[in-house]
A protein has these predicted regions:
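Cleavable N-terminal export/targeting peptides
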Residues: 1-73, 99-103
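Outer-membrane pore/translocation modules
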Residues: 30-38, 42, 96-243, 268, ...
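Subset of outer-membrane beta-barrel
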Residues: 37, 41, 78-101, 132, ...
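Surface-exposed strand-loop-strand hairpins of Gram-negative outer-membrane beta-barrel proteins
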Residues: 50-86, 117-133
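Residue-level detector of the transmembrane beta-barrel scaffold of outer-membrane proteins
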Residues: 53-64, 102-110, 153-157, 215-219, ...
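Transmembrane beta-barrel architecture of outer-membrane proteins
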Residues: 82-90, 133-139, 194-200, 243-247, ...
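Residue-level signature of outer-membrane beta-barrel architecture
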Residues: 91-97, 142-146, 201-209, 252-256, ...
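Outer membrane beta-barrel transmembrane domains
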Residues: 228-331
């Protein structure tokens, strides 16, 4: 089974069920704590839409392109993508702009929900258990943006995540009957909270063209937090990790109707990950590419910059594969 957060309990179960492997109470607590830390850390990465894209229809690009590249997609990874649901609602508020120093101050953030529901086969008993997990999050950050030159900008931000994790496990088999007392309420059928700080910096090189614009960007993030709650007797640990995104985006404007502008949007990113995120994603780095059509609204609004539809590919992670996606406020 694929190693992934929210499917994490399977790995713990496998260790517990080994007949030759005896865990002390402290070792079991440490194992559960690490799994909870990975849940929160990986949710931070997967709910950042600049880092990971989830669509409404998933597929294996190998079947479309007549290829056999394991890093591009597989039946297992596409099946896993189909079980994951991610919803985000980003927002941004301008605070103050100093025209003399070309410094902008703003608040931005997002509300998010990430969940997965899947069958869990613990032993060869013919009946699978069911496990449903989700993480709800609210993120808010302050950003100081400096215009270094005509093309270069530099942003420094500090933010915080408030996150809630919930596990609902249904025992359909007797595979875990002898171990229910040490996992129920500790690893499964429980909940936990985390408050996570995230400083980050971003450099951006922008070129405006008669046909639109393109830019290169590099954004480095580090996060560290404190967990608490019912899970694992309150020993939820300290989610910690980092990710670094380097990418290029291009917007080609091909049609304009009044205020409405239609554009072709393309992007290519490399994402490096570390800390509690790398094992869950099955890699230390992966790539994402997107292409699509965007349209700005024909009326003036501060809430919607553009909407569109397109295609996204993930290469090299546990969630490799392709998706049809809806774009919202791409910039």
């Amino acid at each position: 089974m694929l190693r992934f957060p929210f499917a994490v309990s399977t790995s713990v179960f496998a260790i517990i069920l080994l007949p030759s492997f005896a865990l002390s109470a402290q070792e079991l607590n440490d194992l559960i704590q690490k799994e909870l830390e990975r849940n929160f850390a990986t949710a931070i990465v997967l709910t950042d839409s600049d880092v990971f894209t989830v669509g409404f229809h998933d597929f294996d690009p190998n079947e479309w392109l007549n290829l056999d590249n394991e890093e591009l997609g597989s039946a297992d990874s596409v099946n896993l993508r189909k079980k994951i649901g991610v919803s985000t609602l980003p927002f941004e508020f301008a605070l103050y702009e100093d025209p003399d120093s070309q410094i902008k101050h703003s608040l931005q953030g997002r509300l998010s929900a990430l969940g997965i529901e899947q069958d869990v086969s613990i032993a060869d008993v013919g009946v699978s258990d069911s496990h449903r997990e989700y993480v709800l999050g609210a993120f808010l950050e302050y950003t100081n943006s400096r215009q270094l030159s005509e093309n270069w900008t530099f942003d420094a931000s500090i933010g915080a995540h408030l996150m809630y994790y919930r596990s609902d496990y249904t025992y359909r088999s007797d595979a875990l009957a002898d171990y229910k007392s040490v996992i129920d309420g500790y690893l499964v059928n429980t909940d936990a909270w985390a408050l996570v700080a995230e400083p980050n910096v971003q450099a951006k090189y922008l070129q405006m063209k008669p046909w639109g614009k393109w830019y290169y960007w590099s954004s480095a993030h580090y996060f560290y937090g404190q967990g608490w709650g019912e899970a694992n007797r309150g020993q939820v640990g300290n989610p910690e990790g980092w990710y670094w995104v380097n990418g290029v985006k291009m917007f080609y404007d091909f049609e304009k109707w009044g205020r409405a502008v239609q554009s072709v949007y393309t992007s290519f990113n490399r994402v490096d990950v570390g800390g509690d995120t790398s094992e869950s994603l099955g890699t230390h780095h992966y790539y994402e590419a997107s292409v699509g059509w965007l349209m700005t609204p024909p009326f003036k609004t501060q809430w919607v910059d553009n909407v569109g539809i397109g295609l996204s590919l993930n290469y090299g992670s546990a969630l490799k594969g392709g998706s049809l996606v809806l774009f919202f406020n791409q910039d």
